Structures are given as structure tokens and as C-alpha cells.
Amino acid sequence: MKNILDYTLEELTLWMKENNESSFRAKQIMSWIYKDVRNFSDMRNMPKSLIAKLEENFEISLPEIEEIYKSELDGTEKFLFKFSDGNLIESVLMRYKHGNSICISTQIGCRMGCKFCASTIDGRIRNLTTGEILSQILVVQNYIGERISNVVLMGSGEPLDNYENVMKFLEVVSAEYGLNIGQRHITLSTCGIVPKIYELADKELSITLAISLHAFSDEKRKEIMPIANKYSIDEILNACKYFINKTKRRITFEYSLVKDVNDSKEDARALGKLLKGMLCHVNLIPVNEIKERTFKRSSKETIQDFANILSNLGIEVTVRREMGSDINAACGQLRRSYIKTQETRGE
């Protein structure tokens, strides 16, 4: 049984033609699905014969909410979802004055091996399908009864390592027939898979591209990010410049500050020199400490000094506001702790 959420409008239209149904039915079905109708029999303008075909060939498959954790500090909510195969993923809902933002996962686990990230510790289990990525938004919207207006692909997984499914997701989530979330309200974060950055640039989407940089030199980057052994910083920056040229969109560089690893004033000056002249913005992130790693976060004073140096060098910079710190809202942390708890209980 296929999950109809995995289909784009074009793909569903083709299915209609192949099954001797009117093409316009595809758009009607999409309209029902993205209005939260979860049974084909409730699609009132569908002929019974088509409903029977849909029920025979498709399902509308959504994950179950396994756990919800709500921050007492800022209202951030972390959702732990379970799919039909038993695998778990997590999403984070962040509420702002300008609207609701959700951080979603694109893979179960991750194989990139970044040393400061909990989601990569057990490697990649599998990719999420297009529908499984979309379903995180659908379930949360239904739960809170409010619209999600901003999406960040910064949860578990490397989006460009699940390229085809993520590209289909970007189409549906921003399409009028889908969730109709403007591309300028979508951010995709990558550790820097260079060939895929070029492919993404050629699509000329209006999304924001965020690069997990975390170091100014290849030598230092290799210590914390294995991907640096395959793609150099120069290669990544060249791909970023190509992306900027094709899309006219500013790049965000993410920089997790780790005490005594990449947070010195020399690091800040070198980073500023590296990025000077680029249409970019640096987002400084106090590293999330996890049990399996020895990394410690930099002090507030060190972080502010780092930001000031970049700003004085003409680099646009912000320090990421921490959300949900009391509920381990960083990617991968909830899933791992939940699995360990279940193992301890023998479940």
C-alpha cells in the first residue's frame, strides 16, 4: 500500500491518467488531504468508484505522537513520532510573535558523523520518504490547531543525503495545492555535500541555504566533521557563491562554538577574513552538550567577543536564541534518551 503523501500533484495526475480517471481529480484529492481529511471516503466530491480505487491502492499514513515535551522556559514543544515500522524521529515546534516555526527531520539517524551532534551517534538507519517529512508538519498543525508558517530542515539527518525525497518535499510544502508555505520561509541546513549544493542552486528556489561550517580551516574542520575529508572549505565556498549567483539569496553559515576548540579570537578573525565580501550571515550557536561527547560550550563572554569581532569585520552575525534547553531540544537528543529508557525498562 502506497502512502499518497509521497506523491506530488504531477505524480498523482499521472496515476489518474494511467487508471482511466480524470486528471483534475488529482488536485481535488490534494486539496482534501491538505485540509486534514484523513479518509478517502470523506472526500465528498469524489465518485464512489474512484474512492474504491484509492482505498485499494493508497493509504494516508501519518506517524503516531509517542511523546510530547513542553519547555517551561519558552513554550517550545518537542514531538517524538513513531512510524508504522517502529522507527522514531523528532520535531521541534517553536512559537514566535511572527508565527509558528517547526524544525523537522529528514532521516532516521545520520551518517555524516559530526562530533557535536547526537543524531549521528548510531549512524543512519534509513531515509524518510517525502510523505514522512511532510507528515511532521501535518501532525503538529493538527495537534495545535494553528498554521505552521516557517520550516527549518535542521532536525535529525542530512537533507542533501536524502536529496530526491527532500526536493519533492520542498515542492509540495510550498505549492498552492500543498501546504502553501512560502519558500522564503524555509531553511535547509547541510554539512556541505558540494555536488548537491550545485544541483540545488540550479533549481533556483527561494529557500535559505544554511551551511554547517563550524571552523575556518580544513584542518580544524576535519577534527569535528568527517565530511571535511571529502570536501574542502574552498569547494564549499565556491558552491555557495554559485548558489548566491543563481538564486540571489543570502547564505547562512552556522558556527557551533565549542570551548577551546574553535572559539578563540584568532578563530573569529580568521572566519571573518574567510567570509568577507560574501552575501552571507553567520549564526553563532552555543554547542549543545551531549553525554557521549566531551565538548563543552563556550562562555557567554567568549561568544559575545566572537560575535563582536565578526561584526567589526563587516560580517552580519547573530547568536542563536536558545529554545527548549530544558527539554533537550537539540536534534537527536530526545530520540536517543527515549530509546535508552525503553531498553532499561525492557520494553
UniProtKB/Swiss-Prot annotation:
The disulfide bonds in this chain are 103-331
Q: Which residues form the Radical SAM core domain?
A: 96-326
User: Active site at which residues?
Assistant: 90, 331
Cofactor: how bound: Binds 1 [4Fe-4S] cluster. The cluster is coordinated with 3 cysteines and an exchangeable S-adenosyl-L-methionine.
Q: Which cofactor does it need?
A: [4Fe-4S] cluster
Give the miscellaneous note. Answer: Reaction proceeds by a ping-pong mechanism involving intermediate methylation of a conserved cysteine residue.
What HAMAP family does this protein map onto? RNA_methyltr_RlmN
What is the name of this protein?
Answer: Probable dual-specificity RNA methyltransferase RlmN
Q: Which organism is it from?
A: Clostridium botulinum (strain Alaska E43 / Type E3)
Q: Specify the taxonomic lineage.
A: Bacteria, Bacillati, Bacillota, Clostridia, Eubacteriales
